[in-house]
Curated annotation (Swiss-Prot):
GO terms for biological process: carbohydrate metabolic process; glycerol-3-phosphate biosynthetic process; glycerol-3-phosphate catabolic process; glycerophospholipid metabolic process; phospholipid biosynthetic process. The gene is gpsA. Belongs to the NAD-dependent glycerol-3-phosphate dehydrogenase family. GO terms for cellular component: cytosol. GO terms for molecular function: glycerol-3-phosphate dehydrogenase [NAD(P)+] activity; NAD binding. Keywords: Cytoplasm, Lipid biosynthesis, Lipid metabolism, NAD, NADP, Nucleotide-binding, Oxidoreductase, Phospholipid biosynthesis, Phospholipid metabolism. This is Glycerol-3-phosphate dehydrogenase [NAD(P)+]. Gene3D superfamilies: N-(1-d-carboxylethyl)-l-norvaline Dehydrogenase, domain 2 (1.10.1040.10), NAD(P)-binding Rossmann-like Domain (3.40.50.720). Pathway: Membrane lipid metabolism; glycerophospholipid metabolism. Sn-glycerol 3-phosphate binds at K109, G137, K192, D252, S262, R263, N264. Catalyzes the reduction of the glycolytic intermediate dihydroxyacetone phosphate (DHAP) to sn-glycerol 3-phosphate (G3P), the key precursor for phospholipid synthesis. It comes from the Bacteria.
Amino acid sequence: MNKFKNIAVYGGGSFGTSLASLAAQNCNNVTLFLRDEEIAKEILHNKTNVKYLGDIKLPTHLQVTTNLSVIKDFELIIIAVPSYAFDDSIKLLKTHGISADNTLLIATKGFARNPTELFSDRLKTLLPHSTTAFFAGSNLAKELAKNLPASASIASLDIDIANKIANNLSSKTFTTNTTSDIVTLQVAGALKNIFAIKSGIDLAKKQGKNARATLIVTVLKEIAILSKALGGTASSRSLDTNLLLEAGVVGDLVLTCYSLGSRNTKFGYELGISSDKKIFLREYKELVEGQEALKLVLDLIKKYDLQMPIISEVANYVIPE
């Protein structure tokens, strides 16, 4: 079975740490790269990342370092940073020697900024000719770190690379599917947090379970609309496509939209029950990915003259007049 011999994970938050734990299930040479010296020491000595994952134990052979000078030596580098930090992270890693010789698996969800575009398009500028894949799935970080059953989609223009990564990550408890449609997977990952806000608002307004189920069908159509505009293979007129029904799209949507454990659903719910929307938005301090993604996707809707009613409805709630 074709696999990568060594794997680096860049990003020491909950998702990055859980992905490192996942990768270590099938690979004995996995290193988590992060900036926080205290967390690095904790993982090294205690095999926990209490700040992000509580007392969940990480694999004993998982390595950790803050020394970026060696990251260039890893065949596969998983990028798991917030969307706002994507550009700076790639630029930083370039100064430490990563190149087109390394394969990148992008687990970051959202859009690149200034200008608004997909991460795959931004990488054409930041790291030309790089071999790149994208990861998305119905994955809560703590459940992933506990090795509970889960699944994900892996997309790459080079399907052999996607399959190779799948070989590294698949196990009895973690299943994968692969695709060459990198656009649809990125679009779904970027939009799902916006739709989760809508789900939270519907919950607050007591719209009922039927409405929340109908929301999933409707938002799949909007994912397809934007995907098609950006060059994906999903069609807004034909949702009977494999990728839309896989873990990285509908699976991720259901998990995010139906769980109050999702920051975005929780935000939407609290916004929906607030008596003064403007005060709530001004005083809400927690990072909400969907709120940030919404501002960016509106640029794309305007650019391509798209009709996406759910996005527009959320914008009316979230963006102050």
